[in-house]
């Protein structure tokens, strides 16, 4: 009987994976409206993440990464152990927490095999996400603004209007805890829509400090978000408070909210920029070593490291690398030194903003535009990027 059941589950899973292989996958984030929830449901949400932390740490403490009884766990408090009941988490939520610990060990093992230096799996101070593994069981869509979660109840959410409920297929979801509140990230699959194949223009991109993004057509993009005076004041206040106290935790949560808001602003700008580039252009760029830029010391108030920290270079680079039609040069390729006319190299210090070739006399008034110039890229590769489609 059990073998027959497992066989049906295996066949059903295989059919689902085959069907979804030809569909578009995306994740939609919806926010739980805490002001429309009862105190009991808010307490359950809080307890879910607290119990998930207890269970995760109990699993990590075992040698086999498994527990026979997950109804209660031992928690270390001030040097002694206390028994805590796991009442709010459903059975499938408990399974997801245990699986996440095993997956983390597997990821560490893979990193170690690649030669990376790894340590042992550590205990968590806070659990920030819980996997809701099965649609229709662990969670359900009740209406256009309500989601039901096992052992918690019906939650009022904002953002379900992004989804056409009749045309998508739901997979798993994640219950997320952020400084700004609670969220549910829904994984959905939809049928691929036929897209017209249009010719895209091939342009070069240079990443820099004075101008963050310089394109070969002369367009420049700059976006910085410096620390606000409010954030600086909160950081000073936090340094004077007792670590671990309630006031310390409240101040830390306010700081995290500000950082989350700034991160959302940067992501919004990068996503809009990436959409325009992906739809209309094939980008040729260089694999800049941004981590080394962060370590560069400068006497100026707004130095190299801070420009990288407050800017969007890292986010833009990650988006460009994920697009398979773009072309990335190695970081060691001398694009700034190469002359697009004769191909010779001429070194220029960072304070020289005008490019001048000492061999043939070629001159470009903006060294960043010269670095992003497609003629320079073609000289470096000794091929025609337009002819080869840059793909």
Description of each model-found segment:
Residues 2-99:
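Gly/serine-rich nucleotide phosphate-binding loop at the start of the catalytic core
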Residues 61, 71-74, 112-123, 246-253, ...:
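Short coil/turn segments at secondary-structure boundaries
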Residues 29-31, 146-148, 169-174, 181-187:
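Ordered hydrophobic segments in well-structured contexts
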């Amino acid at each position: 009987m059990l073998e027959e059941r497992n066989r049906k589950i295996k066949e059903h899973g295989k059919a689902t994976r085959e069907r979804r292989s030809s569909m578009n996958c995306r994740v939609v984030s919806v926010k739980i409206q805490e002001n429309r929830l009862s105190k009991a449901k808010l307490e359950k949400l809080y307890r879910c993440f607290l119990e998930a932390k207890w269970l995760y740490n109990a699993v990590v403490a075992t040698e086999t990464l498994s527990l026979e009884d997950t109804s209660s766990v031992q928690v270390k408090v001030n040097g002694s152990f206390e028994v805590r009941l796991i009442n709010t988490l459903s059975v499938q939520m408990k399974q997801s927490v245990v699986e996440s610990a095993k997956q983390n060990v597997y990821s560490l093992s893979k990193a170690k095999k690649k030669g990376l230096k790894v340590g042992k799996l550590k205990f968590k101070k806070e659990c920030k996400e819980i996997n809701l593994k099965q649609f229709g069981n662990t969670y359900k869509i009740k209406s256009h603004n309500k989601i039901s979660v096992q052992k918690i109840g019906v939650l009022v959410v904002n953002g379900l209007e992004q989804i056409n409920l009749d045309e998508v297929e739901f997979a798993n979801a994640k219950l997320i805890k952020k400084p700004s509140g609670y969220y549910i990230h829904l994984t959905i699959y939809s049928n691929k829509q036929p897209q017209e194949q249009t010719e895209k223009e091939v342009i070069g991109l240079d990443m820099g400090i004075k101008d963050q993004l310089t394109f070969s057509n002369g367009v420049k993009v700059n976006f910085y978000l410096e620390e606000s005076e409010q954030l600086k004041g909160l950081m000073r206040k936090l340094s004077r408070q007792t670590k671990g106290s309630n006031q310390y935790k409240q101040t830390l949560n306010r700081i995290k909210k500000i950082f989350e808001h700034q991160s959302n602003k940067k992501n919004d700008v990068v996503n809009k920029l990436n959409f325009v580039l992906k739809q209309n252009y094939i980008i040729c760029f260089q694999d800049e070593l941004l981590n080394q830029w962060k370590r560069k010391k400068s006497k100026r108030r707004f130095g190299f490291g801070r420009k990288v920290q407050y800017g969007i270079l890292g986010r833009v680079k990650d988006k460009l690398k994920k697009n398979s039609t773009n072309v990335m040069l190695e970081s060691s390729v001398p694009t700034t030194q190469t002359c697009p006319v004769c191909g010779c190299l001429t070194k220029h210090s960072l304070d020289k903003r005008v490019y001048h070739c000492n061999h043939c006399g070629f001159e470009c008034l903006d060294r960043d535009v010269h670095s992003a110039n497609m003629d320079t890229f073609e000289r470096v590769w000794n091929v025609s990027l337009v002819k080869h489609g840059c793909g």
